[in-house]
Amino acid sequence: MFRSRSWFGGPWGGRPKNRLSLEHLKYLYSILEKNTTVSESNRGLLVESLRCIAEILIWGDQHDSLVFDFFLEKNMLSYFLHIMRQKSGGSSFVCVQLLQTLNILFENIRNETSLYYLLSNNHVNSIMVHKFDFSDEDVMGYYILFLKTLSLKLNTHTIHFFYNEHTNDFPLYTEAIKFFNHPESMVRIAVRTISLNVYKVQNPSMLRFIRDKTAAPYFSNLVWFIGKHILELDTCVRTDIDHQSNQKLSNLVAEHLDHLHYLSDILLLEIKDLNAVLTEHLLHKLFVPLYIFSLTPAPPPPSLAVVTQNLAAVLNRNVDIDIQEMHNPRVSSIVALFLLSLVFLVVSHAPLVHALAWVILNGDHSVFKEGAAEILNSYVEHREVVVPGFGEPDESLEQALDTVTGQSSSSSYALSEDSGVESSSPATTELDSQADAVEAEQIKLRNITDEEKQLLQKSSSSTKADFAEMAKPFLDTVLHALDCTENDYLALLSLCLIYAMSHNRGIKNEWFEQVLAKSTRGAFSYKTALIEHLLNIITQSSQPSSRIRLITVEIALELLVTFTRPSSDDSRCITAAQQDLLFSARNQSMVVIRNFYKSEDIFLDLFEDEYNEMRKAQLNVEFLCMDSTILLPPTGTPLTGINFTRRLPCGEVEKARRAIRVYFLLRRTCQKFLNEKESLLPLTNVVNLVQVENVLDLNNSDLIACTVVAKDSSKQRRFLVIDALQLILVEPDAKLLGWGVAKFVGFLQDVEVQGDKDDSRCLHITVHRGGVTHNRTPLLSAKFLFDDHIRCMAAKQRLTKGRSKARQKKMYQIAQLIEIPGQMDSPVYAVGGTMVASSSGGSGNSSGSSSRSSHHRPMFSTANRVPGFAAVLRGSNSAGVSRTQMAPNRSIEGIRNESAGRSRRRSPSSTSGSNLRADHSDRERSPSVSMGSHSSSQSRENSQPRSTGNRSRESSPRMPRPRSEEIPLEDFQHSRNNSPHSRGNPSPASRSHTPIRVLHYDQLSGHSGSPREASLGGTNALLSQLNGLNREVLPTQSSEETSFIGSDGNEATGGSEGRRRGAIETV
């Protein structure tokens, strides 16, 4: 009734209260003594006892040495072994706990003496060789984990506990490698870890045992296992044409990469004898008979080969046709190129990669009989000759290891004998199987006619001549794969192989280029042929309908730079004709971009985004070859999840992206050939931008006070400043009067402004992230509250116009980059219907003046400035930015004020001709008004077809101004150059993106009370200079216009003495 519920209840009650103590271990030992036989009734008790013993031993390792003394004194490991060997019910359940206990014990022991105690009585080796029931997944998992934990404890001192030199017994290694081909991937990974931990121990006798007893059978079985895996991979590629088995193919590629990295790790340990054996097996049992053999053309049907062989016997001619080769396993050329690329990308062991590269670059069909002995002899001394052949070993690894353990120490598993048997016995069997077929075909040959004999003789001789001419058949196959007439399916993998060979550390670059440069066919050079193939790919990629992926173009350009790189004394190894082809491809790519320049609304965002992506993404061919999708035919749908650069474009937007990226890649390559540095990209000069927390001089700048209400209803008082390219929210500096700290900065081109229906003082402003990005979260999305609706409207107007101007400026920069006709010399790029011709007759028009006129009106002038526009601070000799437009309904007073202000701010560094400047200065000094009246009348007559009647600004519709009427600006010089934090090192002047012929002006003045010139003749001369023709302006009926720079209504007299700063005037 009151029986204890614990595992230790019953007759063995009275356990110690302290769970981690020597007394508790003695108590657990008494339980093991009384439960030597495992049954269903006591297996739970035994499991709990084993778990507690492990805890006490780990505690005693760090706190009480008497615990281990008692454990060894009672030889408690023998009880563990006794429990394992029982076949009674529940033993498998207890074995799992035993293996887990041992694993925890060896994993957590830190004291070397305690470890030596545990390993000294050889019970651990007995546990390793015990025949567990590996059909139980738990037993298998804990057993391999136990072996892995022990391998981590291996070093030069502990190796003697595991390897017995007298008996040539090494159970930790031999038992582990038996599971190298286990179906569970975690088990295979653990086996590789165990073997590498064993190889790392530099013990000569142990390494000699591995080389003599286990290396050949292990590596031969491992190579065969990898080969079978490759055949499965090839089957998956052949059947998965529609990208339906992507996950399976990805797993197969990942598994093969694990194999390659494992082999590379073994070779990097630089164990000379072990590497020699592994290199022989890899080269002659896998790479040459399977990879290289798959690069050869598909053989004829066996029946035709037998007929040809028999005909040769009748005609007494020698035709070299190997019947066995026709039945050798092979993979598709796609898979062969992919696998060879992986070898050169992962493995860098010089004897192996050099021999394999020599076979590809210099080898012919004789390599399938002789192997790569010529190259390997220079690396390996006393090397046995091995005939290449891909086949299953005669013995499984488990059988071979059992045989080795039963043999005496003098026996040796000879590599040459093993290799000879593996390669010769399949051949003998194959020849015997073909003997009857040969005899049957000989009977048929007696009945063929003379004409048939002649045809067969010609075919056999031509085949022989073709093989003789193809001195380097494998290299020719690689180069022929670069043909991109249909698509770049084969070309991409061929480029990956060439790139991997040219960048492998085990292959000397000088030798690689020497082999390509020489040839036996006269003046023909494989290097020249390779460069021509690369240029063909580049030329085809710049066509509008090209089916070449971006990654192919990038690798081709990288290889072109690599193979034309100048040596120390010579110039680039490229002819003028080849260089012209490259530049022609760049020009063609610009032609393709021009088709998208006006057709895509988001062209500017695409352009900037592709440039940023190209700068961030560095070419990594090894990472590319980890992607299994390059093994499948190129697809154009994004539904497969394939990266954009590794598939064909889908839709007009992606076609535009591809065209832009191709142009960027070609432009960068051409600049490398010309030794030029990029000076026009990126479109935005980051150096001259305002950054967050910059301290800005806000004196003489227009600010609009506002309250920013965020999504979480938090409110912040800020001042809105609008620059040429940026929207800036500033907070006044607490220490310096008239200075502010930038708290938020965003590009005007990414601003979206919406008014509030309920509140005329409110604007909803969203600043999006620049470019086409997956992160759709905006940089700022908030409600802006202004003091009154006038300031709200002013802010909206400035933001809208600023966004338009910023985007137009960058679009003009792009037009300069891609050399759109009509955009190279003038910033005015025509839009249909916006340019009209002026009358040829009329006084005041000189013969050299332009025949085209357009209407302009001032955008960023100070004559009728609205609060919110960030006036450029006056600096020493720093160029400002001004855009000028003239509208036919502007008042004469506004024109007078504007012209007077601009005449004072005219820059002496203007690029206009000297004659034009002299003419302008003469007209400014002339007080005549009659000429202005006549010119204005002429201008008004010319503009009659465009405007009918006089309408006020409020009543006229707000039509968007055409692009052709705009003059792009220079970048503003930021006022942070005058900051006290940066006075010591002023930043350089902002880079100008405007063309040469654009007029330059000094910075706009922030003061509204400066004296004004009232000369109408000077106004007309300035406006006619800006418009490129001599025109005269007459006063027209003006519309009402509100100005924030204050004058009372005495403006009509032309005097400025009646002006009062701060008042609002209506003109």
Swiss-Prot record:
Name the UniProt record assigns to this protein: Protein CLEC16A homolog
Coiled coil: none
Gene Ontology MF annotations: small GTPase binding
Family recorded in the similarity comment: Belongs to the CLEC16A/gop-1 family.
Keyword Phosphoprotein: no
Cell compartments where the protein resides: Cytoplasmic vesicle, Autophagosome membrane; Late endosome membrane; Golgi apparatus membrane
Transmembrane segments: 333-353
Assigned GO CC terms: autophagosome membrane; Golgi apparatus; Golgi membrane; late endosome; late endosome membrane; membrane
Underlying gene: ema
Compositionally biased region (Low complexity): 409-418, 927-947
GO biological process: autophagy; endosomal transport; endosome to lysosome transport; regulation of autophagosome maturation; vacuolar transport
InterPro entries: CLEC16A/TT9, CLEC16A/TT9_C, CLEC16A/TT9_N
FPL domain span: 50-199
Subunit comment: Interacts with the class C Vps-HOPS complex components; Car, Dor and Vps16a.
Annotated region described as Disordered, given as residue ranges: 409-434, 837-861, 876-993, 1037-1067
Its membrane topology: Single-pass membrane protein
Keyword Transmembrane among UniProt keywords: yes
Keywords: Autophagy, Cytoplasmic vesicle, Endosome, Golgi apparatus, Membrane, Transmembrane, Transmembrane helix
Disruption phenotype: Pupal lethal. Larval neuromuscular junctions (NMJ) display an increase in synaptic bouton number and synaptic area. In Garland cells endosome trafficking is impaired. Early and late endosomes are unable to progress into mature degradative endosomes and lysosomes resulting in enlarged endosomal compartments. In larvae, starvation-induced autophagosomes are significantly decreased in size. However, autophagosomes are able to form and can mature via fusion with endosomes and lysosomes.
Primary localization class, coarse: membrane
Sequence ranges of Basic and acidic residues compositional bias: 917-926, 951-974, 1057-1067
Known function: Required for mitophagy, autophagy and endosome maturation, possibly by acting in multiple membrane trafficking pathways. Required for endosome trafficking and maturation. Functions with the class C Vps-HOPS complex member Vps16a to promote endosomal maturation into degradative late endosomes and lysosomes. In response to starvation, functions at an early stage of autophagy to promote autophagosome growth and efficient autophagy. Essential for the recruitment of lva-positive Golgi elements to autophagosomes.
Organism: Drosophila melanogaster (Fruit fly)
Polar residues: compositionally biased ranges: 421-432, 876-888, 975-993
